[in-house]
Amino acid sequence: MAQKTRATAARKPRRKVNKNVTQGQAHIKSTFNNTIVSITDPSGAVLSWASAGGMGFKGSRKSTPFAAQQAAEAAAKGAQEHGMRKVDVFVKGPGSGRETAIRALQATGLEVGSIQDVTPSAHNGCRPPKRRRV
């Protein structure tokens, strides 16, 4: 059987457009298993993001406050390359890395304007997971 050759077009690597955005939003999603930090411009376009799993933490170490701190620092450094100076923080979820991620954003030099908790709460919606027996 003859080998088929596929012609693949050479892809040009997409260049990162350096936006100059001084004010934006930091969205921190902190679940029981992971913490994701996304920093956006005021319209909601993501400039930089990082997660605890992406920082090299695996398993139960992803849910630690230290992993959330590392993720927030990495996302803040990426946003500062775009000229970010001030952020409004939106926190979602019940995880352990909420406060630590906010402190890490402040420690990297971003000025925190406001902090809002946007955790969705069910009005008797889905049945919660069964209780753990250890």
Swiss-Prot record:
CC annotations in GO: ribonucleoprotein complex; ribosome
UniProt-annotated stretches for the region Disordered: 1-22
Taxonomy, superkingdom: Bacteria
Pfam families: Ribosomal_S11
Alphabetical keyword list: Ribonucleoprotein, Ribosomal protein, RNA-binding, rRNA-binding
GO molecular function list: rRNA binding; structural constituent of ribosome
SUPFAM superfamilies on file: Translational machinery components (SSF53137)
PROSITE patterns, A to Z: RIBOSOMAL_S11 (PS00054)
Keyword Ribonucleoprotein: yes
Record's compositionally biased regions (Basic residues): 9-18
One GO BP: translation
Function text: Located on the platform of the 30S subunit, it bridges several disparate RNA helices of the 16S rRNA. Forms part of the Shine-Dalgarno cleft in the 70S ribosome.
HAMAP family the record matches: Ribosomal_uS11
Family designation: Belongs to the universal ribosomal protein uS11 family.
Subunit structure, as described in the record: Part of the 30S ribosomal subunit. Interacts with proteins S7 and S18. Binds to IF-3.
Name this protein carries in UniProt: Small ribosomal subunit protein uS11
Gene name of this polypeptide: rpsK
